Amino acid sequence: MNPVSLIFLAFAMSTDAFAAAIGKGSSLDRPRLSEALRTGIIFGVIEAITPLVGWLLGQAASQFVADWDHWIAFVLLVLLGLHMIHNGLRADHATEQEKPGQHSFWILAVTALATSIDALAVGVGLAFVDVNIFLAAGAIGLATMTMVTLGTMLGRALGAVTGKRAEMVGGVVLILVGATILYEHLSAA
């Protein structure tokens, strides 16, 4: 795989995570750069690990992954999105409920895993092409870290505009990302 293709692959793998990061950033109370970097690192590490795991699974598991990856991502993202919408609705009835300063590690890790399932499938495919898997995984992780950090900060700006509804907007974004993943896989079949 040539370097230009690798760069395009890395950024393509980061787009779902970028969209999710916008939602996550909008649901926080003015996230600082350190929180955006923390979010980016968590997403980047997970996004770098998943193609390695996929590569190790090889062709034997590729049919299972190809058949179910979109459903797994869809369900996880919809559940996380509904949870965020529920929290946003609950915040409307609470008096002076504050947004969190940061999301828990586990919420970020599950979101990152849900948005990186496609990278798992890509990793399986990379097992059959001439590519340094460690270089590819590193490029995917670095691109994702960068895009998620930027997405979190962009979400911060959107959160200031949307006010109390920011978490609901973030939930809708996650559901739309999940629906897009499902649609793309079903329409390609």
UniProtKB/Swiss-Prot annotation:
GO CC terms of this entry: plasma membrane
Pfam families named in the record: Mntp (PF02659)
Organism domain of life: Bacteria
Transmembrane stretches, start-end: 3-23, 41-61, 65-85, 106-128, 141-161, 168-188
InterPro entries assigned to the protein according to its UniProt record, in alphabetical order: Mntp/YtaF, Put_MntP
Membrane topology: Multi-pass membrane protein
Keywords, comma-separated and alphabetical: Cell inner membrane, Cell membrane, Ion transport, Manganese, Membrane, Transmembrane, Transmembrane helix, Transport
Keyword Protein biosynthesis recorded: no
Location within or outside the cell: Cell inner membrane
GO biological process per UniProt: intracellular manganese ion homeostasis; manganese ion export across plasma membrane
GO molecular function terms noted in the UniProt entry: manganese ion transmembrane transporter activity
Purpose of the protein: Probably functions as a manganese efflux pump.
PANTHER family: MANGANESE EFFLUX PUMP MNTP-RELATED
Family: Belongs to the MntP (TC 9.B.29) family.
HAMAP family (alphabetical): MntP_pump
Name of the protein this chain belongs to: Putative manganese efflux pump MntP
Organism: Pseudomonas aeruginosa (strain ATCC 15692 / DSM 22644 / CIP 104116 / JCM 14847 / LMG 12228 / 1C / PRS 101 / PAO1)
Gene field: mntP
